[in-house]
Amino acid sequence: MKSILGFFMLLCLVFGTVYTKEQVRITMKQYQLVNGLTVILHEDHSAPIASVMVMYHVGSKNEKPKRTGFAHLFEHMMFQGSKNYNDDYFKPLQEAGANINGSTTPDRTNYYEVVPSNFLELALFMEADRMGGLLDAMTQEKLDNQRDVVKNERRQRYDNQPYGTAFEKISELMYPKTHPYNWTTIGSLEDLSAASMDDVKAFFRQYYSPSNASLVIAGDFDSKQAKEWVTKYFGGLTNGAPITRPSQPQPVLSQEIRMNYEDSVQLPRVYMVWQSVPQGNKDEAALDVVDQF
């Protein structure tokens, strides 16, 4: 009994220490270039690495019906070379030991590099060059190549994957055809096939501009030096035409909706979906936790 009581008291002591621990505070500096690019700097010298992320405020919600999949297709095109480095984007950074990737959601597209801190300038140069000079190196061959890659990705992850089209059907059920959340980021095979070079160039000119992007640098670097590099590589980039944001109201579901569909799977699956709150809402974090249960 004494040993059990002692163990219980030890647990109380340990967990009490954890919960009274001081909160981690992340300091940052935020400013904006003349061309509208938002820059966020966070120094952390605990390891000799630096992370660069560029987030463009464009996603599949900015697409139009019959032109779906453009935002995700552009994620692929951004790794195909640009004005001053017309080659595989991964090559020089991976030779420096970098970790590189990008992702697309309905609301944003982001690209990042985690590099040894002495290669931070290289990462900034590469990001700035494709922000300002992607169209200078874009060709029909590159577009056709990446279009086929994205089509294969759709077949692999959606069409030929068990339950792969479930969320497409859910999106169509939750949102009307005119709403930008009606379709998924991958787009349809028909829309991807219909994408022309002019369509792709127009999408880039409209959304891939400094004033529609945020640049974040975090890790082992000197802020003064980083600011000089940011001005050097991003400061001279220009913006396109003003951006019109989608303004579709959130559809209200007045009653429960049910749907049954057959798929080539061995076991049935049930999906239960609720409309949630917008990003930044005070209840967002709590609902994210509930979602895990």
Kindly label every feature range from the protein language model.
Residues 140, 147, 201-233:
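Non-catalytic, conformational "gating/processing" segments within enzyme and secreted inhibitor domains
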Residues 81, 114-146:
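M16/insulysin-pitrilysin zinc metalloprotease superfamily fold
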Residues 65, 121-124, 160, 228, ...:
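Solvent-exposed, non-transmembrane alpha-helical starts
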Residues 68-82:
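Active-site SXXK
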Residues 6-15:
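Bacterial N-terminal signal peptides
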